[in-house]
């Protein structure tokens, strides 16, 4: 009996083995990487599929296919016996690879050859493009039109509300790190070798990681969105950089984008979306490639390329569910290398959607890849961002207080990492993140620790931080936050002006390391020409604790300032300090030399909310003393009666005034929704901040009292109201317009020192919001409207000019204008202006009454003052040169008369022995009507 059972068991085992052998047929597999055969760059999103033979259609694509990932890696296998493998991508020749049945190959490097009849030919030969591609009757165009028409139909945004959890990780790595480690210099960095990742095409070293966990809230009616970051962590080289604008610039580069919008905001530019409802089918050419399976869904692979590859668009693939919904399951997009885009050699996005239980489609995962370079596009920094969505909830009501703040994003003030702020253990992060870190990513802290033990590396970090923050730390450490007091701004140590000559300045500012709520900054300065010492001392108390400076995070503080220094009325100091060395480089035109010595005692309160609404209240006492060519002379008109004719007239008399005191209160309301700007140590918006898209609305009112009673005057009570609007307007891939409008009014009678004088620029550098050919204090007004507009073509015009497009220049045009007037009450040349200060005049005139030299100031006339400029940017990637021309007020009357002179320089007299008076005029010479200005701007 036992032998029978054993026999039966053997039969069953043999039969099972036969069945298993039949159920596990021979598997053919291959994995590797796809690269550009010319450059060696990896190729993401290449279509890869097995071919199969049919009886009636011959060799066709099989149902088994995949795409290379964002790094060009791929893996594919089949058990159906397919051995021919096809590699296909727009712009490259199709590659065919043959395997043996059952073969399993790994580490294969597939080189694809650029197709001269592919993407490049679409741009170069429009005749062929027109012949080969037609929109009318094209199934691909009809397909994309259906997708665009239904793109919002099954989107999660059609739900009444939702909540989702997000995990975001960004890594930075040094790419193509091929060096000779035996050389003397590189031997110092021999420890880096163990951190080199060789799994990619080129060896790379991960140097920085940032990750955060957050929640996203959405409500359809009324429309409200909110992102709340609950935890964040940064470690690596980035944690050593002291410029807050660096982190914000990175956030702006890798911001969330929506393909359903008409344009996509990437790399501080606007790219036309392949699903644009307005110009998609005219901007792109679409091709149906194949039908493949994507995560179990049969999808149509729709490839697309821009009509002009130098326009701001994408190449890529749309994977559209092959049913009546025309729903987008996945997309993979790349930026064409022909685009006039700097510092980026590769940029790709792969985005997946998933279907929720209620049938709506929601984001599932986004992977963004970028390679940045400075000098050599073969070496640079690799950046990768991965965002994963989980926990979609469309049912649970959202608490009302979630949307209590108007801002679309809440970020904790304190960083949640082991460096500063709340400590969260590495083990806790391991449990929180949905995907583990690789060994190379997890070892970043160890790498940085070894770097910071090197004096050479610490010196390099100190130099970079000094340039970007303009301050030198006083701690011998690579960590900027270790310093208690920093010295700077470094670009203000030495400067020059007409009054002081060479100006020497030394100062600094404290940090949160000294005290996290009390801050001090100040300086002392000395002029080699006027020999007067100047100073500034500012004490600030912040109501919230800060990590480094009082201008990180939301601003809420009160300040006390004592200052004695030189001021130049009408000088543009919006972006840089007046004594910045670059602002003191003069142009060839003569400067006016109008200066004041001013003592300030000032207190200020500032409060900023998450929604970027802020209020500022300031009280300032000042004592003003004229200097240089500037003088204060009170004009008093007295009535004169002719004893013969009994005619009356008003004759002016001038009373010199040495100084006056001023008491002024200021209230400012500012709203800039979506503004990510960071502020430097002086409280100015950082010049390194590249994202300028947010609008700004600012309403300011001044009320004050000018006290000159000690000079025999009556004093002046005044009110001034001013409104400013600033916004960047994008025109998709066709550039953008930067617009600033400012208007204001002075309500009471005030001397010229309190009138509005347009902001002027006397340096060789272009002032975006100032007048570049107007002289300092040339015009004065009490009612005014100013316009500053600059249009950046972003290369779309020059790209269409053969030959010139090879230079990769970008055109820029602009206009600056001011229109206003001076009412009678504030015109010292009229008797109604009695008691005012005379406009400063130190000019000399020729025999015909024309201005020759010196200084003069006058009310503006009936015409607006207009300047235009045109030029090119992207010269060596960061230089911009503009030709500037003065359009109006090139020959105009001054509001007074001057004696007519003979050839000997003596006044000419009439029959009564009185000087002959002629109308004074000012004619701007040719060199003063035209100018060339330079500016430095990263043309991204």
Predicted regions and their residues:
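Structured extracytoplasmic
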Residues: 117, 121, 128-299, 305-313, ...
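Exposed, low-structure sequence patches enriched in small/polar residues
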Residues: 406-940
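Conserved "repeat-terminator" motif of extracellular CCP/Sushi domains
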Residues: 22-25, 108-126
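A short, amphipathic beta-strand motif
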Residues: 28-36, 72, 110
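A short, solvent-exposed loop/turn motif at the edges and junctions
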Residues: 55-57, 61, 84-98
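Hydrophobic beta-strand segments
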Residues: 46-51, 85, 124, 164, ...
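Short, acidic Ser/Thr/Gly-rich low-complexity loop/linker segments typical of extracellular
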Residues: 54-73
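Short, ordered, surface-exposed loop/turn motifs in non-cytosolic proteins
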Residues: 28-30, 38-56, 80
């Amino acid at each position: 009996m036992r032998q029978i059972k054993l026999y039966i068991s053997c039969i069953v085992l043999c039969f099972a083995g036969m069945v298993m052998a039949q159920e596990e047929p021979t598997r053919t597999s291959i994995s590797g990487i796809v690269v550009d055969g010319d450059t060696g760059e990896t190729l993401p999103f290449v279509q890869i599929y097995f071919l199969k033979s049919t009886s009636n259609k011959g060799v066709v694509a099989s149902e088994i296919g995949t795409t290379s990932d964002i790094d060009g890696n791929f893996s594919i296998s089949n058990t159906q016996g397919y051995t021919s493998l096809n590699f296909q991508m727009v712009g490259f020749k199709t590659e065919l690879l043959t395997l043996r049945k059952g073969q399993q190959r790994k580490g294969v490097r597939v080189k694809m050859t650029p197709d001269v009849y592919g993407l490049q030919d679409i741009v170069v030969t429009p005749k062929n493009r027109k012949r080969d591609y037609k929109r009318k009757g094209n199934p691909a165009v009809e397909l994309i039109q259906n997708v665009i028409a239904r793109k919002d139909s099954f989107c999660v945004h059609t739900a009444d509300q939702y909540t989702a959890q997000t995990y975001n990780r960004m890594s930075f790595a040094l790419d193509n790190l091929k060096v000779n480690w035996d050389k003397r210099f590189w031997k110092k960095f021999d420890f880096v070798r163990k951190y080199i990742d060789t799994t990619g095409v080129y060896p790379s070293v991960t140097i920085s990681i940032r990750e955060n966990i957050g929640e996203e809230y959405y409500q359809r009616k009324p429309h409200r969105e909110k992102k709340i970051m609950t935890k964040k962590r940064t470690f690596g080289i980035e944690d050593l950089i002291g410029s807050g604008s660096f982190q914000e610039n990175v956030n702006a580069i890798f911001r969330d984008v929506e393909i359903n919008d008409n344009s996509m905001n990437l790399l501080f530019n606007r790219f036309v979306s392949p699903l644009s409802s307005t110009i998609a089918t005219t901007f792109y050419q679409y091709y149906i490639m194949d039908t493949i399976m994507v995560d179990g869904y049969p999808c149509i692979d729709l490839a697309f390329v821009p009509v002009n590859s130098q326009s701001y668009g994408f190449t890529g693939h749309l994977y559209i569910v092959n049913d009546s919904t025309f729903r987008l399951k996945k997309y993979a997009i790349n930026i064409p290398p022909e685009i006039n885009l700097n510092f980026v050699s590769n940029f790709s996005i792969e985005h997946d959607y998933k279907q929720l239980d209620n049938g709506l489609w929601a984001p599932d995962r986004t992977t963004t890849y970028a390679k940045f370079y400075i000098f050599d596009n073969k070496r640079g920094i690799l950046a990768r961002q991965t965002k994963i969505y989980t926990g979609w909830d469309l049912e649970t009501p959202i608490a009302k207080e979630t949307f209590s703040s108007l801002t679309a994003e809440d970020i904790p003030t304190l960083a949640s990492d082991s460096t500063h702020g709340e400590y969260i253990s590495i083990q806790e992060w391991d449990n929180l993140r949905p995907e583990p870190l690789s060994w190379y990513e997890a070892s970043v802290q160890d790498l940085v620790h070894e770097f910071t033990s090197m004096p050479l590396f610490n010196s390099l970090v100190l130099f970079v931080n000094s340039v970007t923050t303009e301050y030198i730390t006083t701690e011998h450490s690579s960590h900027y936050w270790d310093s208690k007091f920093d010295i700077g701004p470094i670009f203000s140590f030495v400067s020059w002006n007409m009054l002081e000559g060479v100006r020497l300045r030394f100062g600094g500012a404290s940090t949160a390391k000294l005290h996290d709520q009390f801050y001090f900054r100040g300086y002392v300065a000395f002029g080699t020409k006027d020999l007067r010492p100047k100073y500034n001392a500012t004490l600030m108390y912040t109501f919230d604790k800060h990590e480094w400076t009082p201008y990180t995070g939301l601003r809420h503080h009160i300040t006390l300032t004592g200052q004695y220094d030189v001021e130049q009325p009408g000088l543009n100091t919006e972006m840089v300090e007046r004594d910045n060395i670059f602002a003191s480089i003069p142009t060839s035109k003569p400067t006016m030399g109008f200066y004041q010595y001013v003592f300030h005692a000032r207190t200020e309160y500032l409060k900023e909310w998450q929604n970027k609404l802020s209020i500022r209240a300031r009280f300032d006492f000042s004592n003003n003393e004229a200097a240089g060519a500037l003088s204060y002379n009170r004009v008093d008109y007295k009535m004169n009666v002719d004893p013969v004719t009994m005619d009356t007239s008003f004759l002016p008399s001038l009373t010199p005034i040495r100084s006056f005191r001023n008491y002024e209160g200021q209230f400012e309301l500012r709203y800039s929704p979506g503004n990510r700007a960071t502020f430097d140590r002086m409280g100015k918006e950082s010049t390194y901040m590249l994202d300028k898209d947010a609008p700004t609305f600012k309403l300011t009112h001044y009320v004050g009292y000018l006290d000159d009673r000690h000079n025999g005057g009556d004093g002046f009570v005044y009110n001034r109201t001013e409104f400013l609007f600033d916004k960047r307007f994008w025109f998709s891939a066709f550039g953008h317009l930067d617009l600033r409008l400012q208007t204001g009014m002075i309500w009471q009678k005030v001397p010229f020192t309190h009138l509005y004088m347009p902001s002027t620029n006397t340096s060789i550098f272009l002032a975006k919001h100032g007048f570049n050919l107007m002289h300092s204090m040339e015009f004065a007004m009490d009612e005014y409207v100013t316009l500053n507009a600059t249009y950046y073509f972003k290369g779309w015009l020059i790209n269409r000019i053969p030959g010139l497009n090879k230079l990769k220049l970008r055109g820029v045009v602009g206009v600056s204008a001011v229109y206003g007037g001076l009412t009678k009450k504030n015109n010292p040349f009229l008797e109604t202006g009695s008691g005012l200060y005379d406009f400063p005049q130190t000019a000399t005139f020729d025999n015909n009454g024309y201005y020759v030299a010196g200084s003069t100031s006058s009310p503006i006339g009936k015409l607006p003052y207009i300047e235009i400029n045109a030029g090119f940017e992207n010269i060596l990637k960061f230089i911009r040169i503009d030709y500037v021309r003065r359009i109006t007020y090139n020959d105009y009357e001054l509001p007074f008369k001057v004696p007519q002179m003979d050839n000997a320089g003596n006044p000419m007299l009439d029959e009564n022995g009185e000087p002959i008076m002629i109308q004074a005029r000012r004619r701007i010479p040719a060199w003063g009507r035209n100018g060339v200005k330079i500016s430095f701007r990263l043309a991204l």
